[in-house]
Amino acid sequence: MAMTSWPSTGRQRRHQLASMLLLVLVVVGIYVPVFALLPSLSYTPQSLPSAIPQDEKMISRKFYIKDDNFWKDGNRFQIIGGDLHYFRVLPEYWEDRLLRANALGLNTIQVYVPWNLHEPKPGKMVFEGIGDLVSFLKLCEKLDFLVMLRAGPYICGEWDLGGFPAWLLAVKPRLQLRTSDPVYLKLVERWWDVLLPKVFPLLYSNGGPVIMVQIENEYGSYGNDKAYLRKLVSMARGHLGDDIIVYTTDGGTKETLDKGTVPVADVYSAVDFSTGDDPWPIFKLQKKFNAPGRSPPLSSEFYTGWLTHWGEKITKTDAEFTAASLEKILSRNGSAVLYMVHGGTNFGFYNGANTGSEESDYKPDLTSYDYDAPIKESGDIDNPKFQALQRVIKKYNASPHPISPSNKQRKAYGSIKMQMTTSLFDLVRMTDPADVITSANPISMESVGQMFGFLLYESSYIAKKSGNTLRIPKVHDRAQVFVSCLSQDVDVGVLRYIGTTERWNNQPISLPTIECTTNTSLFILVENMGRVNYGPYIFDDKGILSSVYLDGQILHGWKMIPIPFHNLNQEPNLTFEMQHTKNRSKKFELTNDVGRKEPALFAGEFSINSEEEIKDTYLSFNGWGKGVAFVNEFNIGRYWPSVGPQCNLYVPAPLLKRGKNTLVVFELESPHLELSLEAVDHQDFTCGSNVSKVNQL
């Protein structure tokens, strides 16, 4: 580029210099105000004095630990928080539930991030709809909540596989979850490379609500791999920087804290414990696992209630007892997070499960995650626990509290007539042959690429006149056995339901005498009822996990036929099935007493005349057997009223619409004798032989 020479005279030089200065002022006057408004352009604060006040404001935003206290922008801060899970509440209700938490007096929301919701298949990321974490965090910010983000990768949370994607179970060689297994950590890193950059702009120091990020969850109750924990800290810091508080949560015992804490000064160790425990000796123990001056007392899971499994009495905790226990913490400047402030619903197939001392002692969670929390499953706050906790919290949170919102209106839409549209074996005929897996022996659900729902196993055998004995040593979780006379060229026969064997009650099944011109076909329908989310048995593959024995001999030659339906974060796929089979004649004739045991789809419709009539409702499954239900193709969860205690499934109003609403039920056993369902205006936990009881945890 050629250089321009200046004129020789001083007057000319001064004239041109003045002209150029004027030009520069004009350009600066136009250019800077316009382009300073464009956020996509980078700039330094020194070059743009008008931006300095905003930067100073950002620098002043700081949440930190000092002198055994939490500090927010230079002021001591007491965390009075609550767990509320975006994935258990429809997005249309996020703000409503947060407003109710605000009215309770909370200043902080703690929330898990379930990996399996966001990466249901390897590399397929979902951050829309009920998985829109960023929108949820921004909504918390809008409503002046701080956020404690529990990033996992393991979360527990009574959520399928503790939040791990089930496809991890199919990786070969077998992954060692929750350890420093390098292949497992590489997959965690790939996940966090997506998740944590979404969180970074929402950190408190960056103008967002996130003040703390938790790694793992109650690790001291599971393992002792410090290298694993240090690696998670390193990955989190790599994305989020050194200013964010990284924390762990463990039970309030020396053993669990010894194993679950990270022995570095920049990781904060929080504790959880039973509501009835004296908190202050536990907080004293907590200090031993934090650096000097870095141990503000925090119960990161103050239990407002407890979970309930199918077949148990619904858990209830006394309101005044719970409130008094909370006050023991808050009155001495301790911090606490209510677990849960609002439980919500295990929509889809995402409910978790527990085991006892044996893997076979399997206990799946209810669809409802009400948790006896102060904000009920449907958002109701007109209850003694909300009022008692609110009374205590108001003593310690001086910020203005909004008026408590009124309860959501509910409507009983009445009886819904149902009709059988599709049998299980109609669905089988519709299955693409390319989706059917063949193998000498049964293989797991995960190994055929199916993570949720049902898997049908098919084989054949030569029936004895004296009958046969079938044994499945290891089935996860529940298997219904059918036999029929079928052949490739004769697709007609009598389907017989023979019996059911369960993971927790595994018994041999006697196959009756059946006369077929060809081999007898054997069908075993296995239901995945939810993966274990806590304890040593979280490696919870589903399906038939052993050889199948017929009269003591291994039965070979199997087909695996997927029947997945759709889950919470998948596209609905019922429409084709319903339309394709609605008017088909059934090719199976059902025997009188057992015919009602054939799994089948039932459908019904109900109408809503106006937008004003769209309200929350509940579907009562009294008189039905066991299955899963879909409202307008949304999977609202499992029902099992014969076992209880949950009788009804919650249907939030945003799932409904003006005009015709469609209900589809996949019934595994026995439909209601009148083939009808009732839409009622209340929850009911009195089914089975179970009644409520009060537990003081």
Swiss-Prot record:
The active site is at 218 (proton donor), 301 (nucleophile). The keyword Secreted applies. Its main location: secreted. GO terms for biological process: carbohydrate metabolic process. Keywords: Apoplast, Glycoprotein, Glycosidase, Hydrolase, Secreted, Signal. It comes from the Eukaryota. InterPro entries: B-gal_1-like, BetaGal1-like_ABD1, BetaGal_gal-bd, Galactose-bd-like_sf, Gly_Hdrlase_35_cat, Glyco_hydro_35_CS, Glycoside_Hdrlase_35, Glycoside_hydrolase_SF. It catalyses: Hydrolysis of terminal non-reducing beta-D-galactose residues in beta-D-galactosides. Ubiquitous, with higher expression levels in roots and siliques. GO terms for molecular function: beta-galactosidase activity. It is an enzyme of class 3 (hydrolase). SUPFAM superfamilies: (Trans)glycosidases, Galactose-binding domain-like. Its EC number is 3.2.1.23. Glycans are attached at residues 333, 519, 573, 583, 690. This is Beta-galactosidase 17. It comes from Arabidopsis thaliana.
